[in-house]
Amino acid sequence: MATIAQLIRKPRKKKKVKSKSPALHYNLNLLNKKVTNVYSPLKRGVCTRVGTMTPKKPNSALRKYAKVRLTNGFEVLTYIPGEGHNLQEHSVTLLRGGRVKDLPGVRYHIVRGTLDTVGVEKRRQQRSAYGAKKPKAKS
């Protein structure tokens, strides 16, 4: 335990909270080549690689992922949610934060139904999360 004299000399430091999605915290101003520390909930990027990845130990699958170069210069791994996708290299995507627990290094999700990414076909429940349109009512 520190004495009062020690605390006066050197006060306790606050713990810095580390971001779980650091690529969303920076903006790049290309006019004056400055990086500003401003948080944005979504970022646009271009796919540089699209593929599948196997998850960590107890799980087994082929999870779809894309490597995306963001507008602020960061290059990150993103998860493509839902069944089936139309993403290729050079597709423009929108991404949000949110990691995938069983894929190491994947800290972001692609937003379905925006820019070049189409929504999930024939999705009935939780449609807004997968960018699916409301199905036509049978008459």
UniProtKB/Swiss-Prot annotation:
SUPFAM superfamilies: Nucleic acid-binding proteins (SSF50249). Keywords: Ribonucleoprotein, Ribosomal protein, RNA-binding, rRNA-binding, tRNA-binding. The keyword Ribonucleoprotein applies. It comes from the Bacteria. GO terms for cellular component: small ribosomal subunit. The keyword Kinase does not apply. One of its GO terms (biological process) is translation. It holds the Pfam family Ribosom_S12_S23. InterPro entries: NA-bd_OB-fold, Ribosomal_uS12, Ribosomal_uS12_bac. GO terms for molecular function: rRNA binding; structural constituent of ribosome; tRNA binding. With S4 and S5 plays an important role in translational accuracy. Part of the 30S ribosomal subunit. Contacts proteins S8 and S17. May interact with IF1 in the 30S initiation complex. Belongs to the universal ribosomal protein uS12 family. This is Small ribosomal subunit protein uS12. It comes from Mycoplasma pneumoniae (strain ATCC 29342 / M129 / Subtype 1). The gene is rpsL.
